[in-house]
Amino acid sequence: MALSTHLQLLQQKRGTIKWEVKNMKILSILMCYLLGTILTGEIVTYIMTGESASKLGTSGNPGMANVMSHLGIIPGIIVLLGDILKCVCAMLIGYYFIDASKTGILIGGALCTIGHDFPFWRKFKGGKGVATTCSVIFIYGPMAGFISLIVGLLTVIVTKYLCVGAVVIPLIMIPFAFKNNLIDGLLMTGLTLLMFYKNYPQLSIIKTHQAEKNDIIAGLKNKLGHK
């Protein structure tokens, strides 16, 4: 009888632990998304102008490129660092509380990117997730990530279209992710499709030469020349 009672208590304890672990994973998923909804671009823009980033330029994008274009290099760098920091925090949560592997890192980063792209408090109209996606890619696979970032940068320099380079970066990482495992490959494919979706308005008008061009080299020279 005592042994039977002891076994029942053990089973109940295991069930409680499983339930707690499940709840922790759900909470971690929510935290990763919520971290993504902290838009550094909105904070920096409000501090500098007293207005929302939605009023910056024609796009109203709270990302680094738009902030740098209208407010300067330093504010743009601050936005970049803020977006990288929140993504790193989300990836750490993913690793320690969702799955202690590269998959956990990818899940955390992907959720943060979704939060950045679709923040609930901004009527789900956020950034394009370029900085967060690049952060995920580099930490997920430093060597392959570095290569994809360089290729993406060269693509922007050659084509002068940021939207093209933004899609190329995660696209290159898909084979590397599938090589690791199926789930990682599907997650990386999802990030690529998300990047394509967020950049589709610009991609769709490239042929008509109406898409916004980004001459990085000329832009930097111009910015530095005004200092």
Regions found by a protein language model. Name each.
Residues 11-23:
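Short, Lys/Arg-enriched N-terminal segments with co-localized hydrophobic residues
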Residues 21-29, 89-107, 138-144, 176-187:
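Helix-coil boundary and interhelical linker segments in multi-pass alpha-helical membrane proteins
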Residues 24-49:
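N-terminal signal-anchor transmembrane alpha helix
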Residues 43-74, 204-227:
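Cytosolic, membrane-interface loops and tails of multi-pass inner-membrane proteins
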Residues 51-61, 120-134, 161-168:
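Short, non-helical or kinked segments that cap or interrupt transmembrane helices
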Residues 68-71, 94-97, 115, 130-159, ...:
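Interfacial segments of multi-pass membrane proteins
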Residues 75-81, 85-119, 152-153, 160:
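Nucleotide and nucleotide-moiety/phosphate-recognizing core
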Residues 79-93, 130-131, 145-150, 166-170, ...:
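Core segments of transmembrane alpha-helices
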